[in-house]
Amino acid sequence: LLLALALPACGSADVPEATTPLKRGTGVGLKRIGSFEAPVYVAGAPGFPKLLFVVEQGGTVRVLRGGHELGRPFLDISGLISSGGERGLLSIAFPPDYRRTRRFYVYYTDPAGNIRIDEFKSRSATRAARGSRRAIVQIPHPVNANHNGGQLQFLGDWLYFGTGDGGSGGDPPNNAQNPHKLLGKLLRVDPRELRPDPQVFSIGLRNPFRFSFDTVTDPGRPRLAIGDVGQDEFEELDYTTVAAAHGANFGWDALEGFAPYRGANSGTPDPGGTVKPIFAYPHSRGGSCSIIGGYVVADRHLPALYKRYVYADLCEGELRSLVPHLHGASGEHKLGLRIDTPSSFGEDTRSRVYVASLEGPVYRLVPR
């Protein structure tokens, strides 16, 4: 599998046996926007609404203008990274003031396996400037090639990112529950500082490969949605206010989904006071293996999905949605849309939602 990532519309360990597809005529389709080399993320840049950036795992960022791919990549750091399996160039983020500063950030694994976040500057709207690289964060990831995390997201001036627990099975070093380790965490950093120092924001995560902020459900109280990849039994969705997530413990490796974790290297006691997922689903559902966390849709041109959370599973391939609540979820549905090996969702500056397939295609969710 590319990613070792890892909940149901309920607040208990019970998992629904099946979900119901959306009825015909509810109006969601897929529009193919291009084909790329192992695309793993899609993003827009504030101030440039006609541009769309596609991250390729091998180390390049492609740019589309007005829906058309440009010939030269926006960025090529293939010489700086290790790629393959769960490693590679994994995401890109543009700050709110990008049009003025031209600074942007990428998350990747280097040849030694370390997790790195670097800053670059763009010389034009469609090309990064050579020689502009500045190291922001480096986190040792010395033993295993999996569970690297990979997401970057801005909320205000803070750059948030999620790290995996260091890999293997059951988090043998207990990184996720150790507040002094930077693995198995949601972290944030102020990249404007001269020497940026990452802060632990939340602990107890296994591999939060994709997370997002929900600013549409309650604009005054932004919420955080984390697709945290499970190990043997369950995939989970964590959803809470950003304020409540600060200092929160999401439970791994004492818990997997709603249940005590009982696989390899189990035995970590439940620390108590953990934030439980709002939704979990078993690997027995359609051959599932790894949640691909998405977005709470803010695009009003998609009324069938407006304020609903969209997500998928790497192995199952079905696109699904649900209504997230702070203490549960409701209305979990198949969208009647399936793609091979979904690797990520993405969002542009107009809140339009995209989904990438590791096989190459990238699609936009459109009304129909």
Where are these regions (language model features)?
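Beta-propeller blade signature
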Residues: 117-125, 175-191, 241
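Beta-propeller fold recognition
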Residues: 235, 239, 243-258
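Surface-exposed loop and turn segments in beta-propeller and other repeat-based domains
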Residues: 72-87, 132-148, 182, 187, ...
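Beta-propeller blade termini and top-face loops
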Residues: 163-167, 174, 179, 188, ...
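Bacterial N-terminal signal peptides
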Residues: 1-9
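Short, contiguous, pocket-lining structural segments
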Residues: 174-182, 199-207, 212, 229
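Acidic, Gly/Ser/Thr-rich repeat motifs that build Ca2+-stabilized beta-propeller blades
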Residues: 10-170, 210-234, 287-323, 327, ...
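Conserved blade-ending motifs and adjacent loop-strand segments that build the rim/top face
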Residues: 328-349
